[in-house]
UniProtKB/Swiss-Prot annotation:
InterPro entries: B30.2/SPRY (IPR001870), B30.2/SPRY_sf (IPR043136), BTN3A2-like_Ig-C (IPR053896), Butyrophylin_SPRY (IPR003879), ConA-like_dom_sf (IPR013320), Ig-like_dom (IPR007110), Ig-like_dom_sf (IPR036179), Ig-like_fold (IPR013783). Disulfide bonds join C50-C124, C164-C218. SMART domains: IG, IGv, PRY, SPRY. The keyword Transmembrane helix applies. Expressed in mammary tissue. Residues 1-26 form the signal peptide. This is Butyrophilin subfamily 1 member A1.
Amino acid sequence: MAVFPNSCLAGCLLIFILLQLPKLDSAPFDVIGPQEPILAVVGEDAELPCRLSPNVSAKGMELRWFREKVSPAVFVSREGQEQEGEEMAEYRGRVSLVEDHIAEGSVAVRIQEVKASDDGEYRCFFRQDENYEEAIVHLKVAALGSDPHISMKVQESGEIQLECTSVGWYPEPQVQWRTHRGEEFPSMSESRNPDEEGLFTVRASVIIRDSSMKNVSCCIRNLLLGQEKEVEVSIPASFFPRLTPWMVAVAVILVVLGLLTIGSIFFTWRLYKERSRQRRNEFSSKEKLLEELKWKRATLHAVDVTLDPDTAHPHLFLYEDSKSVRLEDSRQKLPEKPERFDSWPCVMGREAFTSGRHYWEVEVGDRTDWAIGVCRENVMKKGFDPMTPENGFWAVELYGNGYWALTPLRTPLPLAGPPRRVGVFLDYESGDIFFYNMTDGSHIYTFSKASFSGPLRPFFCLWSCGKKPLTICPVTDGLEGVMVVADAKDISKEIPLSPMGEDSASGDIETLHSKLIPLQPSQGVP
């Protein structure tokens, strides 16, 4: 009878241990990357390793290497299969997974035929169930250029110009000139210009006036590789002419004539520049008037846009009027719906457009990251599908201190100033979507001749949390007190426009040469 309690205790202990086993499989882990940057030479292969701590198997985990954004990524593997559709075009077909030690939690991504554009920071991301971690891997790309070549040119003044040229360097190399005694001296001018592959072509020139410098060498160094290439040239003594009194007299006369010529050219140039400036200012004023006419006519097609809560990502909080939205760290408990975004922090407008022209404005304020535009009603809302026109998105964004049009290769937008309010104009029949900076009325970007099929809806996205929301502006903000000036040269000819977009009595021909201006400064389009 004394043995029974011990047997019961042992059985209970065994059951407790077995219950803990499933928890061990999904235990938390850390991802560790290399402490030092990975150095790779252009044209060769590079491996970006990461490992798990503790050393548990990475089989079956989601493995992702990416750069600035999670998607599209450099490499994605899910359940042991590469997901090429989620990879960046410039890496597709050049990356593979090195999984020799995957059972010990050590894996790497191999990049074949490294390019200069591959240089920079990468992140490796491991996910298993609800547990995920990431680490940073730095890749340093280097290329040793061609042997330098020195060309020699004797100038009319008797000075000798040497130009040292070499191609195929990365990153930008250092150029140094030396005398035959090993004394270093700087270049008179240098240029380092990248080619289509991102490799630098180096040109450096010097002027030699001292006839004792018979041998001169040009040395180009790659500081990252710690290697250099050098070439030496000998300057014949006959290249240094001897000065005579008559040569000095001729030189003085030439200098005087040169100064007189320069003075005459200078005054002629100033007169030409002044006249050119006047013509340019007149042309610029007309161009600005026409550009203002485009977006102010767009406001005549203004629509009242509101946010659709059924499409909002759980981290997006909509205001009661459905006009403003902000991103929060906390996740709301919302019903799962097929029309709700579950990965990208986005929300659609309630309004769906299948024809006609439509215009609305969004107050972005001083927020540092957002995306605004139009999307098809049936776009993929689950997962990280790239936001491109091919996938049904036509949008512009502010991300990483830069403005971009979300084309397949992301088009940079060189704006004169940051817009605090953005206007969006959709012309369904022509397939055009225009974006305007309503701070100064300038044009931002246009998606032209798009092929629309089915309903289109306004689209909004936030990339970071913040107290300041993204706000859809009321329709009346841009329509009060708008006037048309029939002739840009005569501002006294003002013709009012109907807020509903009806042309005035002057007709369409007169409107083509009109400028929309606010009746009062406080009533214009912001």
